[in-house]
Amino acid sequence: MKEVLGQDIKILYAMKANPFFTRTAAQEADGLEVCSPGEYAICRRAGVPLEKIVLSGVNKEASHVREVVGDAGISGPAGRSGADALSGPAGTPGPAAYTAESLSQLDLLESCAAKTQGNPLRVLLRLTSGNQFGMDEETILSIIKKRSSYPHLHFTGLQYYSGTQKKQAGKIRKELEQLDALLERIRNELQYEIRELEYGPGFHIPYFEGESPVDEDAMLADFREALDAMAFKGRISLEAGRFLAAPCGSYVTRVVDTKQNQGQNYCIVDGGINHVNYYGQAMAMKIPAIRFLPHPLSPGMPDVQPPGGDSQWTVCGSLCTSGDMLVKNLPLPGLKTGDMLVFDRIGAYAVTEGIYLFLSRRLPAVLTYEKDAGLKLVRGALPTSPFNDGSIQYFEDCIKKENP
């Protein structure tokens, strides 16, 4: 992205897309968007520098904000504002940035900041796209107009994200034009200079058979032209999650049974919809990127491939629900128990968005791959039954066993 967009465009990784990439993103990206206490805890354990964190989220818990503000308050000298609050003097970590999605969040940030001796908090005011997130234009204008009511906050920028999987470049251009108009209005009506814009473009990732491939370089070059056309010349940060993470992940599942019911071939795999999640997939009607890996028959797994030459299979998971269908009518000639299916382009969200606790099935193991280091196990397969047991003592014993 940097090669096409230029080094002046900052890249923020939305870690909700895949938290297992946090350490790598901390090294490669300019920052990370963090939306919960749990995500913040992952960042701190990974050693993510505080100045790389943008604390976002529609629900900011008071205890969590106090924790982050406290961490930020001891990271540098007090009293910086203006350009210094945005960039920080050389060698001094600046405070984390915070998004504000409501007046109550602003009050919370102001209250927490007033109790520390740290820097004024960098705040990005989130503009709504017509839903529960962010605030409308008039509210944002009113906040900036009354900025003296927030002496411990510095409104450095705007944040805007309207959704994912945008196929039309024209929609992104229109959003940038609207943002540019609002920034110009703030400048002209309030004589206030917004210094940074955090924008989530929601670039499209083709997941399914029949979708047109995306020329990513051309798409990014077109996006750069749209940015250059803006009157706004401050700092621009792009929030990207799916676009970065989706191509980086694959899910491997094994065929454990095959059968034929009323002329339809079914294969059962050891995963299911609790592990596999593609945005836009509905009732297994679309075929995602799948590879078929024939495998020698596993011991103790007799081949019960149904008779007949039909190679079209409906792939179902291990959950006891008719909704656990991954793909319908998938061509798999010669399929047998023990074979494996690899679902590609699944690095975003599937690792966390699955209905993992349903039926108390195990969580899948997670491995990372690097060219030099090869495969590395970062999480083994984990039981979910302790979460569903109903016994507090049993759950606590399991936690102690995992974390002695």
Residue ranges of model-derived segments:
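Conserved active-site and cofactor/substrate-binding residues in soluble primary-metabolism enzymes
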Residues: F20, S104, E138, G170, ...
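Short glycine/threonine-rich loop-to-helix capping motif typified by GTGT followed
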Residues: Q168-K174, P206-M219, A246-D257, K328-P331
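Charged (often Lys/Glu-rich) extended helix/loop segments that serve as interaction or gating elements
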Residues: R235-P404
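Active-site flanking residues adjacent to catalytic metal/cofactor-binding acidic residues
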Residues: A100, L125, P201, L238, ...
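Glycine-rich beta-strand-to-loop/alpha-helix junction loops that act as flexible
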Residues: Y161-T164, L197-H204, A240-F243
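An N-cap/entry alpha-helix motif that binds or orients negatively charged groups
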Residues: M1-G6
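Acidic/histidine-enriched ion/cofactor-binding microenvironments in catalytic or ligand-binding pockets
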Residues: Y192-I194, V214-A231, V327-V342
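Active-site-proximal beta-alpha core segment in soluble small-molecule metabolic enzymes
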Residues: D8-E196, D222, A226
